[in-house]
UniProtKB/Swiss-Prot annotation:
GO terms for molecular function: ATP binding; UDP-N-acetylmuramate-L-alanine ligase activity. It comes from Synechococcus sp. (strain JA-3-3Ab) (Cyanobacteria bacterium Yellowstone A-Prime). Cell wall formation. Pfam families: Mur_ligase, Mur_ligase_C, Mur_ligase_M. It catalyses: UDP-N-acetyl-alpha-D-muramate + L-alanine + ATP = UDP-N-acetyl-alpha-D-muramoyl-L-alanine + ADP + phosphate + H(+). The gene is murC. InterPro entries: Mur-like_cat_sf, Mur_ligase_C, Mur_ligase_C_dom_sf, Mur_ligase_cen, Mur_ligase_N, MurCDEF_pg_biosynth, UDP-N-AcMur_Ala_ligase_MurC. One of its GO terms (cellular component) is cytoplasm. It is found in: Cytoplasm. It is an enzyme of class 6 (ligase). Coiled coil: none annotated. Pathway: Cell wall biogenesis; peptidoglycan biosynthesis. One of its GO terms (biological process) is cell division. This is UDP-N-acetylmuramate--L-alanine ligase.
Length: 510
């Protein structure tokens, strides 16, 4: 499958399909072992699986460093939450579930292995739920949370009552998972640790392919091979042909395109993007299906919706049912989620943490025809290092860029500040860049930049969103103290290459 050319891995053609899971993967849940303990239960993927098991009647407990909204939702179901990684949760010899975020030295995981307990990787547990029923798996570097949520919402509207395991929070089902009585399971499929290759969907979806996890993949070729295997294991593969890596390297059964790709069975034409909605004609194999209107903005969300259309039609749904459901879809938490408005400034939380995602989000924001203030927290030092130049050039659609220190996600920080170096590099392409050297200072500093009418977009997959409420309060207090006016004077303390390193007490121009 892998050819070596000039000392580098080259991507071979996609192999033939093998859509049935091998016997060694046939390990469904054992009702005679009814207890499960999740190490790191607060994570979005782990909490979704814990929710499904708890709703099925299994006895579930879990541990994590700190409680959050997901653990509190589980506690309301009767799940026992243990703060900290003690051995308390191993009493009674439960089956133990862990994710790739849990290191082998974790005391709970190490003790479970020493005791000979049944231990599941999160992906294997998902596979046990997923591979033995009609399933739809949504994979891709970007857009998989929104696309899987759209498909789930569509099937709910059609009365199919699906089970859903999603990587984001949806108000429609109050969380990141729901247990339905219908036969279909819709799951978001994670490629970050390569575990997508453990799943064998009836319908596999691939939204796009890029390098996003250099902590796991050495290069793009390795990423492509993982997606090739996932596509090979899908009975029917639905994929976006606008992505060159998809169109070139995958054997796609059902393609979709916004750009008129000639091999795409599903196409969006006569596309109109406005500040309120996105609309397009949807064509199926050369015939007009009808008009699609979305509340969620931007070309990336239209592409996500077109994937949902293709899946719905493959399942036999009428286009009118699909279009009605997608017209009602209001998005996923942390995906261009409006957190509130203060003094004419709209505060938005968005999970974008890859250059392509940032570009797509900021393009959608520009449709509002308002000044865009982008606040970005890099996520993982390895990602920032690998994609540094792409990050430096991805903020063109923001009028002001504010960068804060990198969220390491457990990675060791490099010497010096990689986020400050990013700010310096962004300033080579952008006239208005600010750097805040300490995240807790952000609510004290950002209000001095904001103006009535702004869109303040907080971008990142780390803990930046935890500063939004405090920033809104600080901006409200600032408005109460004095009218907000443009500051036209000299900026104190100019730093290298036009970057302002902002202290908490400074009032700066926008």
């Amino acid at each position: 499958m892998v050819e070596t050319v000039g000392g580098k891995d080259a991507v071979a053609p996609a192999p033939a399909r093998s859509p049935s899971p091998p016997a060694k993967n046939l390990d469904p849940l054992n009702p005679l072992l009814p207890a499960y303990h999740f190490v790191g239960i607060g994570g979005v993927g782990m909490s979704a699986l814990a929710y499904i098991l708890a709703k099925q009647g299994f006895r579930v407990s879990g541990s994590d460093i700190a409680a959050n909204g997901r653990t509190r939702r589980l506690e309301a179901l009767g799940v026992r939450f243990i703060q900290g990684h003690t051995l308390e949760g191993l009493a009674g010899d439960p089956q133990v579930v862990y994710s790739s975020a849990i290191r082998p030295t974790n005391p709970e995981l190490a003790a479970a292995l020493d005791k000979g307990l049944k231990v599941w990787h999160r992906a294997d547990l998902l596979a046990a739920l997923f591979n033995h029923r009609p399933s739809i798996g949504v994979a891709g570097t970007h857009g998989k949370t929104t696309t899987s949520s759209m498909i789930g919402y569509m099937l709910l509207a059609a009365g199919w009552d699906p089970t859903l395991i999603i990587g984001g929070e949806m108000d429609a089902w109050d969380g990141n998972a729901r247990l339905g009585q219908g036969e279909y399971l819709v799951a978001e499929v994670d490629e970050s640790d390569g575990s997508l290759v453990r799943l064998y969907p009836q319908i596999g979806v691939i939204t796009n392919i890029e390098l996003d996890h250099p902590d796991h993949y050495a290069n793009l070729e390795q990423v492509i091979r993982a997606f090739q295997q996932y596509g090979q294991q899908s009975q029917t593969l639905v994929a976006c042909l606008d992505c060159p890596n998809v169109a070139t390297h995958l054997k796609v059964d059902i393609g979709y395109s916004l750009a008129g790709h000639p091999q795409a069975q599903y196409q969006a034409r006569q596309i109109l993007y406005t500040a309120d909605c996105t609309s397009a004609e949807i064509w199926e194999r050369g015939s007009l299906l009808g008009q699609l209107r979305l509340q969620v903005l931007g070309s990336h969300n239209l592409s996500n919706a077109l994937a949902a259309v293709a899946v719905g039609r493959q399942l036999g749904l009428e286009f009118a049912v699909i279009a009605s459901a997608l017209a009602e879809f209001r998005g996923v938490q942390r995906r261009f989620e409006v957190k509130g408005e203060v003094g004419g400034v709209t505060f938005i939380d968005d999970y974008a943490h890859h250059p392509s995602e940032i570009r797509a989000t900021l393009r959608a924001a520009r449709l509002q025809q308002r000044r865009v203030v982008a606040v970005f927290q890099p996520h993982r030092h390895s990602r920032l290092a690998k994609l540094f130049q792409d990050f430096a050039c991805c903020f063109a659609d923001a009028q002001v860029v504010v960068i804060v220190p990198t969220y390491g996600a457990g990675e060791a920080a490099p010497e010096g500040s990689d986020s400050l170096r990013l700010a310096v590099s962004v300033a080579e392409h952008h006239p208005h860049v600010r750097y805040v050297s300490s995240l807790p200072q952000l609510p004290q500093v950002l209000p001095s930049i904001l103006q009535p009418g702004d869109l303040a977009i907080f971008l990142g997959a780390g803990d930046l969103n935890q500063q939004i409420a405090a920033t809104m309060r600080a901006y409200a207090a600032r408005l109460g103290e004095q009218p907000l006016a443009n500051f036209e004077g000299k900026l104190p303390g100019q730093a290298e290459d036009g970057i302002r390193e902002m202290g908490a007490s400074e009032v700066l121009a926008s």
